[in-house]
C-alpha cells in the first residue's frame, strides 16, 4: 500500500478487528500492517479488541530503536485531544512516563524537523532531507538558511560541491508525485505556483528551469519497471475532477502527472514514443519532451489541456502517430496506462466500449492488441472492467513499483494480478473456526 490511499485499508482492518475471528487474523499478522503501510495505520485499531496488542507491538518497536516506528508515533498535544490520547496509549504500553517517552521518541527520530525546531538549520544535510520534507519546508530553508541551501541547489547540477564532495537528493523514499510537489513548492514565492495551478489556474509566466531540486529528484527515481519488457504509453487525466486531494496536499492530478512523465521517460530512447504522453482533452494530442527537463515537461503538461476524458480520441491519436512514425509491432506501445480518477465520458456505443472500439482499429491496422492498465488515482468506485477480463489490470495508489508486479505476470486479468501481488506474503493462519467472518 505504501503512500497510497489509506482510508480504505484502515476501514477494513478496523472492521476486521471488531469481529472475533477477524481480530484473531489481525493479531496473528500485526507485523504486516507497518510493512505494507505505515506505523500510524495501527491507530485504526484503537477502540477495538486488538488495540492493546497493537500498542504493545508499536511500543516494543520504538524501544528497540526502530526509527520509522518512532517517526509515526503520535506526539503529546495540548490542542489536539485525540493525538494526546493516542500518545498516552502508546507510552503506557511502553511502561514509561510522558517525559521519558518524549525523550525516547526524540532520540529515535532523526528528522529535519528536530533541527528546525531548535533553529539549527546549519546542521541540516540537504542531501539527506526526505522528498516530502523538501517540498514542505522549501520556503523555510530559503528564509533561515538561504546561503547554504542555494549552494546545495546549485551544486546539484554538477553532482559535487566546491570541495569535491558528492551532492545528491534523498531518493530513498521518492515517488514521481513528490517531484511535482517539490517543483511547485520551489515556485511558491512567485505567487502563481502550485495552489493556483492545481485548481485550474495557469502559471506559464514562471521560469520552471530554476527548479533544480525537482529535476534532480526526478533523475534520481529508481527504475521500477526494469525487466518487464513493456512499452508503456501513459494516457493521463487532466480533467477538473482530478484536483481532488488524495493524501495531505497531494492531488490526484499530481499522481497522474508524475506517473505519466515517469513512464514516458522509461521507454527506450530509440523508440519513437520515447518521452511522449497524451493528456485527456477534447482534442487529444501527443506531447513530446524528449530534449527537455522534467520541470519543462510539467509546464507542457499544464499548457492548454482542459476538458473531457475522451479515451477514444486518445487511442486514435496513438494509432495515427504510430502510422506516421512507421512504427513496427515491436515499437508501438504494448501497454496503455490510463491514469485517471475513473470519471470518464459516456463510454458505450453500439454495445462496445470506447476502449474496445479503439483497440479494434489497432488490430485492423496490423498491430498487436495492447494490454490496458487502469490506474485509479483518486480511490473512486468507478470500475471500467470486470475481475475476469483478460488483458486488463485495475490498480490504485501512488507507487510505480506496483507496475513491475502487474506487468511481470503471464495471466493478465484483475483477479490474477491481485493474487500475484499477495502470494509473496506468508500470512499466519490463526486457530479459528472455519466459517465466514462477519
What are these regions (language model features)?
Residues 1-255, 265-438:
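Long lumenal/extracellular ectodomains of secretory and single-pass membrane proteins
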Amino acid at each position: 500500500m505504501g503512500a497510497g490511499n489509506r482510508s480504505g485499508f484502515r476501514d477494513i482492518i478496523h472492521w476486521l478487528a471488531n469481529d472475533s475471528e477477524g481480530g484473531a487474523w489481525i493479531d496473528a499478522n500485526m507485523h504486516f500492517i507497518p510493512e505494507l503501510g505505515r506505523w500510524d495505520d495501527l491507530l485504526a485499531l484503537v477502540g477495538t479488541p486488538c488495540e492493546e496488542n497493537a500498542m504493545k507491538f508499536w511500543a516494543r518497536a520504538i524501544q528497540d530503536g526502530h526509527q520509522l516506528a518512532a517517526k509515526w508515533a503520535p506526539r503529546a498535544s495540548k490542542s489536539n485531544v485525540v493525538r494526546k490520547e493516542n500518545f498516552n496509549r502508546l507510552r503506557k504500553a511502553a511502561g514509561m512516563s510522558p517525559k521519558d517517552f518524549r525523550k525516547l521518541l526524540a532520540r529515535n527520530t532523526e528528522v529535519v524537523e528536530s533541527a528546525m525546531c531548535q533553529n539549527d538549520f546549519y546542521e541540516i544535510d540537504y542531501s539527506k532531507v526526505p522528498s516530502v520534507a523538501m517540498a514542505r519546508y522549501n520556503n523555510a530553508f530559503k528564509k533561515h538558511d538561504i546561503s547554504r541551501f542555494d549552494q546545495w541547489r546549485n551544486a546539484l547540477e554538477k553532482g559535487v560541491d566546491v570541495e569535491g564532495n558528492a551532492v545528491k537528493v534523498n531518493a530513498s523514499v521518492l515517488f514521481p508525485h513528490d517531484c511535482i510537489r517539490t517543483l511547485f513548492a520551489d515556485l511558491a514565492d512567485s505567487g502563481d505556483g502550485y495552489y493556483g495551478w492545481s485548481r485550474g489556474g495557469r502559471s506559464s509566466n514562471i521560469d520552471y528551469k530554476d527548479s533544480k531540486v525537482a529535476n534532480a529528484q526526478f533523475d534520481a527515481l529508481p527504475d521500477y519497471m526494469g525487466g518487464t519488457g513493456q512499452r508503456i504509453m501513459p494516457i493521463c487525466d487532466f480533467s477538473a475532477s482530478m484536483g481532488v486531494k488524495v493524501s495531505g496536499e497531494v492531488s490526484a492530478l499530481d499522481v497522474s502527472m508524475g506517473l505519466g512523465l515517469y513512464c514516458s521517460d522509461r521507454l527506450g530512447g530509440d523508440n519513437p514514443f520515447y518521452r511522449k504522453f497524451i493528456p485527456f482533452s477534447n482534442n487529444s494530442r501527443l506531447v513530446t519532451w524528449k530534449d527537455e527537463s522534467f520541470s519543462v515537461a510539467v509546464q507542457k503538461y499544464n499548457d492548454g489541456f482542459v476538458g473531457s476524458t475522451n479515451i477514444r480520441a486518445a487511442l486514435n491519436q496513438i494509432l495515427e502517430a504510430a502510422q506516421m512514425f512507421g512504427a513496427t509491432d515491436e515499437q508501438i506501445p504494448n501497454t496503455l496506462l490510463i491514469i485517471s480518477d475513473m470519471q470518464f465520458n459516456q463510454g458505450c456505443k453500439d454495445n462496445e466500449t470506447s476502449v474496445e472500439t479503439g483497440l479494434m482499429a489497432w488490430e485492423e491496422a496490423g498491430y498487436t492488441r495492447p494490454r490496458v492498465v487502469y490506474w485509479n488515482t483518486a480511490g473512486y468506485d468507478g470500475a471500467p472492467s470486470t475481475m475476469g477480463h483478460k488483458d486488463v489490470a485495475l490498480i490504485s495508489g501512488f507507487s510505480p513499483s506496483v507496475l513491475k508486479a502487474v506487468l511481470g505476470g503471464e495471466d493478465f486479468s484483475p483477479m490474477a494480478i491481485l493474487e500475484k501481488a499477495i502470494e509473496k506474503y506468508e500470512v499466519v493462519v490463526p486457530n479459528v473456526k472455519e466459517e465466514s467472518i462477519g
